[in-house]
Amino acid sequence: DCTGHGVPGGFMSMLGVSMLNDMATADSIQSPSLMLQSLRHNIVTALGQTSFDEDNHDGMDIALCTFDTKSGILNYAGANLPIIINSKSEIPPSDRIQPYQDGLYELKPDRMPVALYDKMDSFSEIRIKLSPGDAVYLFTDGYVDQFGGPKSKKFGHDAFRALISSVKNLSFSEQKQIIWSTIERWKGETENQTDDILVMGLKLPGK
């Protein structure tokens, strides 16, 4: 999810996708956190960023995962974007793993973008084991930040988690229909779509 609109945002998206594709095909970096650090270095270099400027928001928010099909291990690193896991197995909670009802967990990101920032810490990584039938949801902030409803407010993270919880046992085609119709009803006839919206679900084969 790149900052900026129009040409600047589109350029940043193309740059990020190209760099991630190069890293994935090179097969030299397997760790999502190291990939984000490499991506940040490459973007800062490509944009010629030399100092942090609060008025310059060129950068990228991203949730990046790798999955080992043999071990069932998911590795996640995030720059401002969390992910949601629906798991039949209990995942131990931590300061970065927040459990919710009915097997839903939110994996929290590092609070910094892929860009030159006032905090340039290393990206951290969460490693969990998934089970057959578990699902992973990745999403940009366009859905939760969409204005609408009777009070013209943001949809919000709590409502989004509740929505995922309510549809998680349905087929993905049914989930897609409900998730889309929900935000359309929320937006109504008076609100414009405020940002790009992406919600992506991945389910492990099995029970």
Regions found by a protein language model. Give the residues of each.
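Active-site-proximal, acidic helix/loop segment immediately C-terminal to a metal-coordinating Asp/Glu
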Residues: 7-28, 124, 130-190
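Phosphate-binding active sites in nucleotide-utilizing proteins
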Residues: 4
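Intrinsically disordered or compositionally simple regulatory linkers and C-terminal tails
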Residues: 203-207
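Catalytic core of PPM/PP2C metal-dependent serine/threonine phosphatase domains
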Residues: 7-88, 123, 188-194, 202
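Cytochrome P450 core scaffold surrounding the K-helix E-X-X-R motif
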Residues: 85-91, 118, 147-153
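Short, basic, low-complexity termini and linkers enriched in Ser/Thr/Gly/Pro
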Residues: 87-104
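DG-centered beta-turn motif at the end of beta-strands
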Residues: 1, 81, 140-142, 196
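Short gly/ser/thr-rich secondary-structure transition/capping motifs
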Residues: 57, 116-122, 181
